[in-house]
């Protein structure tokens, strides 16, 4: 039986811990969830923006390479689309035991776990009897050089086996480790949307080389950010670790998060 949903996952920032020497303070992992029956709409959305911006037909849209005035119409289209977005925002300097996360892909795996939990809740709560498929999601990661997706499958398998011990909150009827694929953004248009979402939240939290953040992009996406009973934080936006909470509650640069995404 085929899946009901398709989930596209991409990231922004890096996993390094050399702050002040090139590593980003934040790492963002985002998912864009769409119904498989409407997946063609993601292709049309990207094609429409590409032609609006006068970009070559086959060239993938990379959010960071677009000018500010080109990013806005792209995000306006996403905000108006029939999809949902989930983002995990990791503040690396707040991690209590950074040495634990220097191990290869460890930080990435943690972010994948938190993202998978929220994606699975959305899919579980939005399945309907009319839907085609078995209620699960096909997960498409943006291909990262040097990473084997068998490793992610193995990691999710491990979480599934140890769900109770590790207090994993993934709904396994929605997320199935054997339904994971990795593609390059040029072959799956939804990945270009996931890149735009991850980059938007990254720019909202990560200061530029001149010390400024830009939160307009993240605010524009509010109509499609997953929420539960009006609550965004903990659902469509997961901040991690908890040690970053004080900073987010008090610093001026996170005002957008406190006001737009309560």
Kindly give the residue locations of the regions a language model identified.
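Phosphate-ester processing/binding pockets and catalytic centers
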Residues: 1-262
């Amino acid at each position: 039986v085929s899946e009901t949903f398709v989930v596209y996952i991409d990231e922004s920032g890096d996993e390094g811990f050399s702050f002040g020497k090139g590593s980003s303070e934040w790492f963002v992992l985002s998912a864009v969830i769409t119904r498989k029956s409407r997946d063609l709409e993601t292709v049309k959305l990207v094609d429409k923006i590409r032609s609006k911006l006068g970009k070559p037909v086959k060239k993938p849209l990379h959010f960071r390479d677009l000018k500010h005035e080109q990013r806005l119409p792209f995000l306006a289209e996403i905000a108006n689309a029939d999809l949902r977005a989930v983002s995990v925002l990791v503040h690396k300097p707040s991690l209590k035991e950074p040495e634990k996360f220097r191990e290869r892909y460890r930080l990435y795996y943690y972010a994948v776990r938190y993202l998978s939990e929220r994606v699975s809740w959305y899919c579980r709560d939005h399945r309907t009897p009319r839907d085609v498929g078995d209620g699960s999601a096909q997960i498409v990661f943006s291909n990262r050089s040097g990473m084997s997706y068998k490793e992610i499958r193995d990691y999710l398998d491990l979480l599934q086996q140890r769900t109770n011990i590790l207090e994993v909150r993934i709904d396994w009827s929605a997320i199935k480790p054997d339904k994971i694929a990795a593609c390059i953004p040029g072959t799956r248009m939804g990945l270009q949307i996931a890149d735009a979402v991850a980059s938007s939240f990254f720019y909202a939290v990560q200061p530029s080389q001149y010390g400024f953040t830009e939160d307009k992009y993240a605010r524009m996406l509010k109509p499609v950010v997953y929420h539960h009973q009006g609550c965004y934080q903990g659902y469509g936006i997961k901040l991690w670790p908890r040690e970053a909470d004080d900073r987010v509650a008090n610093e001026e640069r996170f005002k957008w998060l406190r006001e737009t995404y309560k």
